[in-house]
Curated annotation (Swiss-Prot):
Completely overlaps MET4. It comes from the Eukaryota. This is Putative uncharacterized protein YNL103W-A.
């Protein structure tokens, strides 16, 4: 998992797990 600060931003944008996975995928790609 990313830092709590970054994680909070992701949670703010998408609280759903699958949505987070998409965001992580975009960052990785």
């Amino acid at each position: 998992m990313l830092s709590k600060s970054n994680n909070t931003l992701f949670n703010h944008d998408c609280s759903l797990s699958f949505c987070k996975e998409k965001v992580y995928s975009k960052l990785l790609v």
